[in-house]
């Protein structure tokens, strides 16, 4: 391993020269294939920290899908039911635990994950590599690769696919630096350990959090730790199902993440699962068509002369009433927020997406209103006392 890696350019093609380097010692990575770019590496290093912490917290293999320095998906290896396998388009393959985590992370928000960078907590096996090979992505970072997996990945994207191996034992300095406008910022790294001890203070009337919900709250909080702020994360069944990143308004975060969670659940509606696709439709076209079909712009794919491009017969509209009725059956969702909720409107929006459990710092002057809104819906809310801003 070297102490410097020259890059083609920085964030944009005009930003030259570009490199990553270590002032002391060697880089903890080895590029096994491809030529990763500046943003690829930002995604790689942020996503690696996320999956490493997920694995440590849950003791399960973990995976993340990153785009523009925020996760589109994050998950651990919780076995999937047949419905999830079908909507993630992995019902035709054998899934190892790591492949299961990857399928969940990639499948949560397929529109946002298109062209992502992948992080894996464990050695990439053949089953995971075969799944990665089917999707459009920029690269992957993992602690190692089996020979079979590496061979598959090296042949992806005409041999240019980015494959990075990272030393899992690497620990950065406790002080980190960042230059902005020629001025150096220095701070202690956010080494806060996220575990169930953060969920002990519950100001709500309902204070019962099942084990799987505690796991999901931990997943949401760790995901937020590496998401551009402001951020909110909905989680269920061992994975993030909706991430709202980089919004200036807290309620906009909650709405954005909630809308993504709604889409995740609506994809499980029988009308969506039984859409009559034409043969050999491209994966990207199928994902985009589902996204439009679920939305209020469904005519864009159902109008005469257009639906024939995607379907063997014209599907029925998924009506607003049908969507609301289906969403009303979604329950047991966990939600994390990287900062406090200033008003109860966030809770009202979360309730519409089946949220039953919440973890947020607390500390708003309107905490009483937020708590009473949770009590109205019999939600459990934990005050973690920690803020998780990330920039």
Residue ranges and their predicted role:
Residues 53, 226, 263-267, 352, ...:
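Conserved helix-loop functional segments at active or binding sites
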Residues 23-35, 108-114, 188-207, 284-306, ...:
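Gly-rich Lys/Arg/Thr-decorated short loops/hinges at beta-loop-alpha junctions or inter-strand turns
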Residues 219, 227, 234-237, 244, ...:
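Nucleic-acid 5′ end/cap handling module spanning
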């Amino acid at each position: 391993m070297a102490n410097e890696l020259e890059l083609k350019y920085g964030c944009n093609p005009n930003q030259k020269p570009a490199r990553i380097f270590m002032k002391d010692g060697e880089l903890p990575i080895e590029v096994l294939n491809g030529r990763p770019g500046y943003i690829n590496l930002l995604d790689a290093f942020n996503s690696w920290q996320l999956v490493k912490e997920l694995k440590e917290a849950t003791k399960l293999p973990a995976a993340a899908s990153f785009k523009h320095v925020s996760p589109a998906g994050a998950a651990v290896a919780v076995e999937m039911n047949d419905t999830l396998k079908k909507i993630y388009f992995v019902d035709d393959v054998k899934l190892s635990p790591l492949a299961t985590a990857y399928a969940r992370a990639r499948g949560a928000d397929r529109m946002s994950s298109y062209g992502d960078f992948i992080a894996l907590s464990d050695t990439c096996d053949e089953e995971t590599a075969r799944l990665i090979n089917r999707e459009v992505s920029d690269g992957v970072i993992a602690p190692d690769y089996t020979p079979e997996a590496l061979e598959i990945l090296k042949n992806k994207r005409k041999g240019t696919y980015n494959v990075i191996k990272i030393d899992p034992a690497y620990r950065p300095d406790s002080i980190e630096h960042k230059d902005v406008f020629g001025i150096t910022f220095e701070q202690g790294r956010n080494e806060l350990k996220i575990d169930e001890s953060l969920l002990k203070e519950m100001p709500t009337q309902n204070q019962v959090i099942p084990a799987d919900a505690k796991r999901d709250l931990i997943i949401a909080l760790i995901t937020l730790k590496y998401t551009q702020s402001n951020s909110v994360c909905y989680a269920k069944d061992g994975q993030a199902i909706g991430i709202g990143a980089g919004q200036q308004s807290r309620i906009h975060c909650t709405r954005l993440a909630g809308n993504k969670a709604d889409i995740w659940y609506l994809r499980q509606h029988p009308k969506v699962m039984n859409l009559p696709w034409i043969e050999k439709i491209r994966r990207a076209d199928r994902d985009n068509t589902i996204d439009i079909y679920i939305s209020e712009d469904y005519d864009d794919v159902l109008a005469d002369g257009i639906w024939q491009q995607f379907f063997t017969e014209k599907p029925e509209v998924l009506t607003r009433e049908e969507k609301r009725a289906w969403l009303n059956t979604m329950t047991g969702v966990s939600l994390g927020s990287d900062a406090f909720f200033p008003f109860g409107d966030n809770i009202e929006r979360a309730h519409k997406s089946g949220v039953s459990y919440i973890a947020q710092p607390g500390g708003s002057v309107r905490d009483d209103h937020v708590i009473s809104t949770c009590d109205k819906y019999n939600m459990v809310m934990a005050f973690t006392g920690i803020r998780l801003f990330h920039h």
